[in-house]
Amino acid sequence: HGYSRLALIPAFDDRAGLASPILPNSVHGAIGAIIRERQESERLAARGISPTRSAILVGPPGVGKTLSARWIASSLGKPLWVLDLTAVMSSLLGKTGNNLRAALDHAKKHAAVLLLDEIDAIAKRRSDESDIGELKRLVTVMLQEVDQWPDSGLLLAATNHPELVDPALWRR
């Protein structure tokens, strides 16, 4: 399995429950809205509306991005799978696109909540002159995957450096 080399694992299984993290009201409200949409996905689908399928969590280290992702997954009764993209980049350059796609396909099949940690490691602005061609191709892979993410799953990304993330990813 290609995804096994990417350390895609059910990193946190808080389905028994996890207390709501202490967050600013605006952040708590935005995350709560995503949870409510996901919980009401059948009612939304009956009206031809798709729930939120992806979100980017932003902030400096230690602010609670991973804890927030855990809370979202727990509230939805699903485990949180974490894919550390920094590790992916350091170990698999040359095969990263295929392996990333395999990991994402695996997560789709299991309707998991998937957190792409350190999204800025691969989803850099395509205008970055210092970037190598493979990284630019990875941005394209990520954009295609986000566009095709099923309503049954939730794709989260986390970054400490929002200014490095390709603007096209923000629009999704």
Regions found by a protein language model. Give the residues of each.
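ABC-family P-loop ATPase nucleotide-binding domain
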Residues: 19-22
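Interdomain "pre-motor" coupling segment immediately N-terminal to P-loop NTPase/helicase cores
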Residues: 1-17
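Walker A/P-loop NTP-binding motif of AAA+ ATPase domains
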Residues: 26-32, 36-172
